[in-house]
Amino acid sequence: YRAVHLNIPVTNKLVSIVGEIDHPLTVRVPLGTTVKEAISLAGKITVEDPAYVMGGPMMGRLGTENTVITKTTNAIIILPKDHHVVVRMEKNLDIEKRRASSSCCQCRTCTDMCSRHALGHPIEPHKVMRAVANHDLSDLSVFINAAYCSGCGICEKYACPQGLSPKSIIQQFKGGLRGAGIKVEKVEPAPVLEDRELRKLPVHRLAARLDLARYD
């Protein structure tokens, strides 16, 4: 707001520092501050071998002590390196594709819980997983519609009963579309699903599933 409407450049950012730390807090720090410097404001880390999640547990990425705060950084989550969230972020995508081939049961829960699908966008994660599992390129719209994925992570962090990674696979296709300069044609979205409100994910259940409720 200040940058757009008041012509004041963004030079600092509010960042929440939470997880395995003595005194979790939200603090305003200058852009370019390292993770190590920011964390020192919240006390001592309470685990010996920490991992640093930059952003949220659903859409964030792993960083290091030397990662710097940018204008898009909103949180640093300190977790043990063997924590479920960290392990999932370190997964090998080639292995995940092979797991899709062997384990995806086409229950379509990923699509049923997809927030973009519920809004009427033509993204169906279960069809992407089916195409990947069977090396099926007969319907390219399945892959092109990956562009409608918001990357929220509900499909792989909560919905999939097999613990597969639809979001990560879809994001790879989405990146490939951008890299190839392919622009997705605008389509008229389908109507919002009537039961969209019933498909929403309770935050407390998500926190419990991710083993993060203890940090609340």
State what each model feature region is.
Residues 1-215:
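Redox cofactor-anchoring modules in respiratory/redox and cofactor-processing assemblies
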